[in-house]
């Protein structure tokens, strides 16, 4: 059972393998069948495609667009060189010669930060979207700004209500203007200027010095602020005067520059629309006038009928070539004669040298010379063998036969027949060209009208802008008329008052800093007492002028704010400023412009703001006018100069003659040309002569060979080789003689023959062919040209005529495009216009309004600085008025701090001075030294001398309270009532017993020279 199962399993495996192989074969058959079907489908598709392509190919072959094999376009030679078929117009470029007037130097730039501050104040702090209330700025004659009636009436209620921050500021100033005079009255009536607490000057000396220093620094800072304010006031006041004075000059410059700008625009437009059109017209008229010649030449070039002209050139040059060939024949004979003589001569030299080497000189030197000199091949040069030269006589006979037969008349007759085709072309074009010329003349009139219209429009726009500029320079003239005369006087008074206060304060500060302290004993000039007096004077003067100065500053502040909102703010914020929108609405330029015939509708008004914006963008005047529908230069593209451009140019036929009967060469003429090509001249070409026409007649230079022979002769010994020596010497002479007599002649003959042959080739050859091929090629080309003219000449001429009309239309379109491009990019840039306009605006805003605002900044700055100056000056005045006595007693009059019995030491606050006499003036120091010599200044300090004796000796006698024996002597002021410039003496108390020991004296008070704090 197991064996049967083992046998069944292999059989099943074999059966499964056979089934798989059968399936693979079936799959392969299906793939082959599928590929066969696909291949058959591709073959059928290819056959069908071939049948479709064949007619298309035939049509392409018949397409007249390929006029000449291997050439593109119309088959002309100049087109293959990259040159246009009809050359374009070369326009001259406009060169401006404008010179604008020079603007005056700008105002000082040192005030720019002040002006920028006022701009920031008005633009950022006080900025409002709503315009200023009515009645403060009015528009006169729709173009000039002036102050309104509310300014004349000093009615500022609406303005202050509109700007609440301005209201607060004005209220503060008004309160100060009113209150300060009352404070001044109280200050003077209650004697505040004299109520300065003295205190204890010796006790508070150090603190007083510190207070003086701090107050002095504060006053110095305030004085610097005053200086800054007065400088601003003076400079801006001068700028206001200059701004009002430059009005007429600025108007004159603006008029001149506007005229210059207008002339430049007009000249540029005239150059584009008149001068450049005339250039284009002249160019097109020239092409139309010579169009028949151009078309005929292109027809000759494409049909290759120029071969007749080449044939005529070849045959007409035959007599000249004949003369040259006869010269070549004569030179050939001379060449053969002289060449044979030279050849025979060098052969004799070779024979004699070989004989001498073989028989007369068997030395190694002679054998070596024979080998190295190459003399064995001296006569083997091809240039000496003229057997290969052609027979020139046959060429001469062939030329004579051609000249005698007058073959040159054949191409001349063909050219005369071809000229009839040119006459037909000229006749046909005479019906087409005159209308084109009339259209060009009419186009010149059209562009002249457009140039005049454009000039009028531009002149109207510029005139209006210039008028607005001139009127804008008159803005706020009423400011000068109303305040101009008194304003300058008032401003000058204010500046002088501030300057007076400034000088007094500076002088007071200098006296207080460098003057002596007040002592109460006859103070000198320029001391601190003088400084206190000057400060008091400054305080009183400030009280007197503060209200006046602040009132003037307030007036300028209000005036500057109103004028700024009318002149500068509109230019600052043209989009958002409502006042400018209100003013801009009344400035319309359209009523100055000429009426537009092409646009009968009411165009949108051109605003000054739009003009300014265009100038900012550096646009041209044509861009600005196009954007506002005044004039669009792009409308020139609608102009149709040529009337035929309205039609289909493909249907235009400029030539309608039958050229099928044109014959260039008859059958007889062709036979004659064939006979001429097969004459004796048939094989002529200069290349037949060139292999034999060379100048290397010998392998070596004969002169060099003669020198070698001389050298060899000199090297041989005599008399052993005497005959060889003589032989070599003679051969050297012969070699030199042959070179001198034959080589130059032969060389000259060869060069002349080459030149003649080259000239003959140029005369009777075509494209470097020999004569027979030249005649054959030119004849065949003429025959093909004849067939081209007969079959395709008419279509070719019409194609060139259509190309001419298209080229003229393209030239006119290019001209119009050039005008539009130049007008939009180069004509009338707004930069000069902006320059002209902003010079007028500069007169108002930057030269009048800004200085007004700068003036109130300087004035109010000084006025506000007066307030802290009052306080600081009063404090400093009290410090300067303190009296510092020489001695301060201790006891009944007042005990010093700590209850010390010693007197007050004046040097406690003088750390920097240890020697009292250091600061004593020179006069007093000398007087003191003289008195010291007279008195015993250095007393005996020994114990034997009692203090009482010493003091008694110094003091002398005396009575009263000051006597030495007085009981109250200790509490009396020991200093003299009048200081005599001597150090004070110190005494023992009356009750003190005499002491034999040395005792240190108590501190003493010695004022010395007055300190300068």
Curated annotation (Swiss-Prot):
Residues annotated as glycosylated are 99, 116, 576, 618, 803, 824, 949
Enumerate the residue ranges of region (Disordered).
918-1013
Please name the taxonomic classification of the source: Eukaryota, Metazoa, Ecdysozoa, Arthropoda, Hexapoda
Q: What protein family does this chain belong to?
A: Belongs to the prominin family.
Gene name per UniProt: promL
Q: Which GO terms describe its biological process?
A: microvillus organization
Q: Which residues cross the membrane?
A: 32-52, 215-235, 489-509, 535-555, 852-872
Q: What is this protein called?
A: Prominin-like protein
Q: Which UniProt keywords apply?
A: Glycoprotein, Membrane, Transmembrane, Transmembrane helix
The source's domain of life comes to Eukaryota
- GO CC terms in record: apical plasma membrane
Q: Which InterPro entries match?
A: Prominin
Cell compartment(s), UniProt: Membrane
Membrane topology for this entry?
Multi-pass membrane protein
């Amino acid at each position: 059972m197991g064996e049967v199962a083992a046998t069944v399993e292999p059989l099943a495996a074999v059966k499964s393998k056979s089934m798989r192989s059968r399936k693979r074969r079936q799959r392969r058959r299906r793939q082959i069948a599928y590929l066969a079907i696909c291949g058959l489908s591709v073959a059928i598709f290819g056959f069908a495609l071939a049948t479709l392509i064949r007619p298309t190919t035939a049509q392409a072959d018949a397409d007249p667009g390929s006029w000449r094999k291997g050439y593109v376009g119309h088959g002309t030679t100049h087109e293959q060189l990259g040159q246009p078929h009809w050359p374009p117009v070369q326009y001259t470029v406009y060169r401006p010669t404008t010179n604008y007037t020079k603007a005056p130097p700008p105002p000082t730039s040192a005030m720019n930060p002040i002006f920028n501050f006022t701009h920031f104040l008005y633009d950022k702090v006080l900025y409002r979207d709503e315009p200023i209330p009515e009645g403060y700025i009015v528009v006169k004659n729709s173009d000039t700004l002036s102050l309104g009636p509310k300014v004349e009436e000093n009615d500022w209620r609406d303005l202050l209500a509109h700007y609440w921050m301005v209201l607060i500021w004005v209220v503060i100033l008004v309160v100060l203007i009113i209150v300060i005079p009352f404070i001044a009255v109280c200050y003077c009536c209650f004697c505040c200027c004299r109520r300065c607490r003295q205190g204890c000057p010796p006790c508070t000396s150090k603190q007083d010095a510190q207070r003086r220093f701090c107050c002095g620094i504060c006053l110095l800072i305030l004085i610097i602020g005053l200086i800054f304010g007065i400088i601003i006031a003076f400079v801006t006041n001068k700028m206001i005067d200059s701004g009002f004075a430059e009005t007429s000059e600025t108007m004159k410059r603006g008029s001149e520059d506007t005229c210059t700008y207008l002339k430049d625009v007009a000249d540029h437009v005239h150059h584009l629309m008149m001068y450049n059109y005339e250039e284009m017209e002249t160019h097109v008229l020239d092409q139309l006038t010579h169009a028949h010649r151009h078309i005929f030449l292109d027809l000759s070039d494409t049909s290759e009928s120029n071969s007749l002209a080449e044939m005529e050139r070849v045959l007409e040059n035959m007599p000249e070539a004949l003369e040259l060939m006869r010269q070549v024949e004569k030179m050939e004979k001379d060449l053969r004669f002289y060449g044979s003589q030279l050849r025979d001569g060098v052969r004799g030299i070779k024979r004699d040298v070989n004989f001498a080497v073989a028989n007369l000189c068997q030395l190694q030197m002679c054998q070596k010379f024979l080998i190295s000199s190459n003399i064995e091949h001296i006569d083997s040069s091809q240039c000496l063998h003229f057997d290969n030269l052609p027979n020139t006589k046959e060429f001469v006979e062939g030329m004579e036969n051609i000249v005698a037969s007058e073959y040159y008349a054949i191409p001349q007759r063909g050219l005369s027949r071809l000229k009839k085709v040119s006459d037909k072309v000229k006749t046909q074009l005479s019906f087409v060209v005159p209308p084109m010329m009339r259209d060009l003349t009419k186009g010149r009139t059209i562009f002249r009208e457009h140039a005049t219209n454009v000039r009028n429009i531009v002149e109207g726009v510029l005139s209006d802008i210039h008028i607005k500029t001139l009127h804008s320079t008159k803005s706020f003239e009423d400011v000068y008329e109303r305040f101009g005369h008194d304003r300058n006087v008032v401003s000058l008074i204010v500046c002088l008052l501030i300057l007076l206060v400034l000088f007094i304060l500076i002088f007071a500060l200098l006296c207080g800093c460098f003057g002596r302290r007040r002592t109460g004993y006859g103070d000198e000039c320029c001391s601190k007492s003088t400084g206190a007096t000057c400060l008091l004077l400054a305080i009183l003067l400030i009280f007197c002028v503060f209200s006046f100065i602040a009132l003037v500053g307030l007036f300028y502040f209000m005036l500057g704010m109103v004028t700024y909102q009318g002149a500068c703010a509109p230019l600052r914020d043209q989009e958002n400023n409502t006042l400018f929108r209100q003013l801009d609405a009344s400035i319309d330029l359209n009523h100055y412009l000429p009426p537009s015939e092409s646009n009968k509708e009411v165009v949108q008004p051109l605003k000054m703001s739009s003009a300014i914006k265009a100038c900012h963008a550096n646009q041209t005047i044509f861009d600005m006018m196009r954007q506002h529908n005044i004039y669009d230069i792009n409308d020139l593209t609608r102009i149709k100069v040529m009337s035929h451009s309205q039609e289909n140019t493909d249907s235009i036929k400029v030539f309608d003659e039958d050229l099928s009967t044109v014959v260039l060469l008859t059958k007889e003429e062709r036979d004659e040309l064939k006979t001429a090509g097969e004459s004796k001249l048939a094989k002529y070409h200069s290349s037949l002569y060139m292999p034999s026409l060379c100048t290397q007649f010998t392998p070596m230079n004969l002169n060099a060979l003669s020198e070698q022979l001389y050298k060899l002769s000199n090297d041989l010994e005599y008399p052993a080789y005497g005959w060889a020596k003589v032989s070599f010497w003679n051969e050297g002479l012969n070699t030199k003689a042959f070179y001198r007599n034959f080589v130059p002649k032969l060389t000259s003959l060869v060069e002349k023959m080459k030149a003649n042959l080259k000239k003959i080739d140029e005369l009777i050859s075509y494209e470097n062919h020999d004569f027979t091929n030249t005649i054959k090629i030119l004849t065949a080309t003429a025959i093909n040209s004849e067939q081209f003219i007969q079959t395709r000449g008419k279509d070719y001429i019409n194609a060139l005529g259509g190309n001419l009309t298209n080229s003229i239309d393209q030239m006119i379109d290019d001209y119009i495009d050039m005008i539009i491009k130049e007008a939009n990019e180069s004509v009338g840039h707004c930069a000069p216009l902006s320059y002209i306009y902003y010079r007028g605006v500069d007169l108002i805003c930057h030269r009048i309004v800004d200085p007004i605002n700068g003036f109130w900044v300087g004035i109010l700055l000084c006025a506000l600085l007066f307030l802290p100056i009052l306080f600081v000056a009063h404090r400093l005045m009290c410090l300067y008025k303190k009296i510092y006595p020489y001695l301060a007693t201790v006891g009944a009059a007042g005990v010093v701090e700590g209850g010390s019995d010693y007197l007050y030491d004046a040097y406690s606050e003088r750390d920097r001075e240890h020697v009292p006499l250091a600061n004593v003036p020179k006069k007093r120091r000398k007087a003191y030294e003289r008195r010291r010599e007279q008195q015993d200044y250095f007393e005996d300090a020994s114990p034997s001398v009692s203090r009482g004796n010493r003091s008694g000796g110094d003091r002398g006698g005396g009575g009263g309270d000051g006597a030495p024996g007085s009981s109250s002597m200790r509490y009396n002021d020991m200093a003299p009532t009048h200081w005599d410039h001597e150090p004070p003496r110190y005494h023992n108390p009356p009750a003190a017993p005499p002491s034999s020991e040395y005792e240190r004296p108590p501190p003493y008070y010695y004022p010395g020279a007055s300190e300068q704090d």
